[in-house]
């Protein structure tokens, strides 16, 4: 066991993230190590991370490697969305998404916060349309280092989609 002091995962603290939507480059593929915590998974996301930084984004939201339409996760964090009707929606585990401890914990406490946890496929277009319409007023990333970090906007190509409540009540409670 090695212990060392660390700072915040994001230097800016808990401020809403701006995400680059990555529709082409995959973080991992079926049959690989996507659900494991291993260096190769992070290395595969570096090219997209460099592009995200160059475009003024904090992180990358990856979709699946096969159809390029189903949300998977960020470079090193799981993804969750709060729906207008009280669901806490997160991509179902498919073998390409990290079985995050923080993700699991949030899903377990969701009912105590009045949320219905739902694990299912989430299409990237469904998400972006839902953010625009207010169906998903809050979205956030979560992970051991990143804890719960609100998402403020998505950059999809040249289109910016802003979240209605980037530091919403539910996200901050979680």
Language-model regions, residue ranges each:
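Helix-start/capping segments and mature chain N-termini
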Residues: 2-174
């Amino acid at each position: 066991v090695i212990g060392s002091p660390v700072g915040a995962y994001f230097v800016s603290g808990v401020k809403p993230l701006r995400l680059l939507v990555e529709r082409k480059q995959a973080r991992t593929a079926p049959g690989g190590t996507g659900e494991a915590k291993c260096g190769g998974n992070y290395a595969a996301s570096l090219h997209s991370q460099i592009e995200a930084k160059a475009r003024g984004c904090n992180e990358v939201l990856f979709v699946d490697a096969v159809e390029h339409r189903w949300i998977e996760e960020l470079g090193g964090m799981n993804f969750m969305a709060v729906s207008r009707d009280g669901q806490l929606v997160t991509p179902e585990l498919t073998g390409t998404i990290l079985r995050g401890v923080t993700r699991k914990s949030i899903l377990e406490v969701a009912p105590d916060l009045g949320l219905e946890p739902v694990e299912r496929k989430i299409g990237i277009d469904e998400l972006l349309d839902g953010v625009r319409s207010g169906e998903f007023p809050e979205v956030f990333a979560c992970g051991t280092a990143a804890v719960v970090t609100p998402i403020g906007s998505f950059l999809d190509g040249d289109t910016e989609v802003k979240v209605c409540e980037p530091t919403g009540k539910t996200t901050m409670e979680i």
